[in-house]
C-alpha cells in the first residue's frame, strides 16, 4: 500500500529543491521544464510552486501578476498600473508624404513621426521599500534581475513595462560628500531630502 499511498500525495513525493518527478512535470506547464531552463530563468523556481496552476492558464490578469510578485518577494505593497502612455515611432512606410496616396485627411493622417499609445505598456509599482530593499531592486542590485525575469515570465504578451520604486516614509537618507555617504548619485540622492518623494522610475529593459 505504501507506493500507492505515496503516489497520490505530493507532500510525500516532494524532494528538496523541487527536484522530484512530479514537480518537474508541474514546472513544464509554465515553460520551465528542465534544470537548464530553470537555471537560466534567474529565479528561485520552487517559490512559484503554489502558483503553477494559475500561471499555466492562457490569460494572466494584472491581479495574478501582482499576487505572484507579492508572494515571491514577500512584499505586500505591489500593484500594476495598466494602460500607461508611451510614444510609438511611426514607420517610414506609414508616414504621410506629399504626392503619395497613403493617408486620408480626417481619418488616418498623423502629423509627426510619433503617436501616443496606451495599449501596450504597464507599470509595476513596488511601494513602502526600506533603504536596503530599494537598493536591491535598482538595476545595480541583486533583486533587479529576478524581478524583471518574473515579470517577463508572468506576461503572456510582449508588452513594455516600467518599474517604479518608492521608499517608505522616513527612509530617505541625506546626501553627504565623502566616505560616509550612503546615497547613489542619480538613484538614491535627492536635494532637500526631507521634501523628496523617494521615487525612481526606469524601464524594465534597463541595463
Residue locations for each model-derived region?
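C-terminal structured domains
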Residues: 67, 71-207
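Feature for intrinsically disordered/low-complexity regulatory segments and propeptides
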Residues: 2-5, 9-72, 76-97
